[in-house]
């Protein structure tokens, strides 16, 4: 895919940004904890979340879909499927399903694409094995494909050494099948969509005031079925916020955006860098929803070292902002970036250098000198949707060619359409 330099300002109101991926995954998987019809409007119709629907269908759920409205009727009991459960590119789907299936009687095989099958799963499989789960796979169950022989699990008191919503949710789901009350704690607060959704479903879960500790009781009855409208994804919206900031005389309003405090850290970083950006809350249900207004801005360099778990998906796009800011910027304490869909630290630095930017890898992040003269280049996405979309936005300033853009469809199927509607010229 080739993106040409955009010569005109952008002025738009965007209401059709992709639905939130995290909530879409959880809606589908958590529906299996109920016994009545679950309904979601604005479900994300991307490859990752459609794969999750296919997984729960193979476990016995009935699914009705009309456009982005999805209805799920859960099975009376989970079936042992006669096929591999394909998670595609989604670490969320795989890690949550490991936790869900570990305590369910049956035999299950989880696999994914070549990128997912090389991402670490021991952070889930190890603690589950310690409480009685039977999980088998390459490199001591660290790499998929993974085979799970579900059975009753022992209660646990687990302290996670990493701040990860995927680890947390997997352990919550396993706790529902344990033989007694379980506790979970983490070193810093990760995304809390699971807790929010499960509390709305009347799950037997208690959350500490600081959100760091959970008490989970085994399920004694089905949870309350869901009927929700899924808000738009702030991680997807971030690319167009960045576009408005870096393109002269531009302004964009984005509506119905999820504004959960654990999801807007990257926006706060942009504000600290000098971005003219406002977030307004319009609705508070089980999640906070609102709109974002942003316009062209001059950015200043910044050091980012806190709340990294809250901006891990936006880090590649933040690196683009760093490259266009005045002065030096850095991101540290972000070693988790090395085990995402790609090694995002190495890949961002490699590709920024190709575009004329002075960038340096750190063990746990990167350092970028802003204000360098950009040059048109061909970059490699390494199959990582967030790398591809970040450099697509940079391409609006300097022109860019991306070697694998199909990966964008895993999370944001209408990204190219929106970019084109804003005036971008794109060749395939």
Swiss-Prot record:
Pathway: Metabolic intermediate biosynthesis; chorismate biosynthesis; chorismate from D-erythrose 4-phosphate and phosphoenolpyruvate: step 6/7. GO terms for cellular component: cytoplasm. Catalyzes the transfer of the enolpyruvyl moiety of phosphoenolpyruvate (PEP) to the 5-hydroxyl of shikimate-3-phosphate (S3P) to produce enolpyruvyl shikimate-3-phosphate and inorganic phosphate. Transmembrane segments: none annotated. This is 3-phosphoshikimate 1-carboxyvinyltransferase. The gene is aroA. Its EC number is 2.5.1.19. Belongs to the EPSP synthase family. It comes from Campylobacter jejuni subsp. jejuni serotype O:2 (strain ATCC 700819 / NCTC 11168). It catalyses: 3-phosphoshikimate + phosphoenolpyruvate = 5-O-(1-carboxyvinyl)-3-phosphoshikimate + phosphate.
């Amino acid at each position: 895919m080739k993106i040409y330099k955009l010569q005109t300002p952008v002025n738009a109101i965007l209401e059709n940004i992709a639905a939130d991926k995290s909530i879409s995954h959880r809606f589908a998987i958590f529906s299996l904890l109920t016994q009545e019809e679950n309904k979601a409007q604005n479900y994300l119709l991307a490859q990752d979340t459609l794969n999750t629907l296919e997984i729960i269908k193979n476990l016995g759920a009935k699914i009705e879909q009309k456009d982005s409205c999805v209805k799920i009727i859960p099975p009376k009991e989970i079936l042992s499927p006669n096929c591999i459960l394909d998670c595609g590119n989604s670490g969320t789907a795989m890690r949550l399903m490991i936790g869900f299936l570990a305590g369910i009687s049956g035999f299950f095989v989880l696999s994914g694409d070549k990128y997912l099958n090389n991402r670490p799963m021991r952070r889930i499989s190890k603690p589950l094995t310690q409480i009685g789960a039977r999980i088998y796979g390459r490199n001591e169950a660290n790499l998929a494909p993974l085979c799970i022989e579900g059975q009753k699990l022992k209660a646990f008191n687990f302290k996670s050494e990493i701040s990860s919503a995927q680890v947390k949710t997997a352990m919550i789901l396993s706790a529902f099948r344990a033989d007694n009350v379980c506790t979970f704690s983490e070193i810093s607060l990760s995304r809390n969509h699971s807790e929010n959704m499960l509390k709305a479903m009347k799950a037997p879960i208690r959350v500490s005031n600081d959100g760091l500790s959970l008490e989970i009781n085994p399920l004694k009855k089905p949870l309350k079925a869901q009927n929700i409208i899924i808000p738009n994804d702030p991680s997807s919206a971030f690319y167009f916020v960045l576009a408005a900031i870096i393109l002269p005389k531009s302004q964009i309003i984005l509506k119905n955006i999820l504004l959960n405090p654990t999801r807007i850290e990257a926006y706060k970083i942009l504000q600290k860098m000098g971005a003219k950006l406002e977030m307004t809350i319009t609705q508070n249900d089980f999640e906070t929803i609102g709109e974002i207004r942003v316009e062209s801005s001059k950015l200043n360099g910044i050091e980012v070292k806190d709340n990294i778990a809250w901006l891990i998906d936006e880090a590649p796009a933040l690196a683009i902002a760093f490259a266009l800011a005045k002065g030096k910027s850095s991101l540290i304490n972000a070693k988790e970036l090395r085990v995402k869909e790609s090694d995002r630290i190495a890949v961002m630095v490699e590709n920024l250098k190709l575009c004329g930017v002075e960038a340096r890898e750190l063990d746990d992040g990167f350092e970028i000198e802003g204000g360098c003269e950009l040059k048109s280049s061909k970059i490699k996405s390494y199959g990582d949707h967030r790398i591809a979309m970040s450099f697509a936005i940079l391409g609006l300033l300097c022109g860019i060619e991306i070697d694998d853009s199909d990966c964008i469809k895993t999370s944001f199927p209408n990204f190219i359409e929106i970019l084109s509607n804003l005036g971008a010229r794109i060749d395939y």
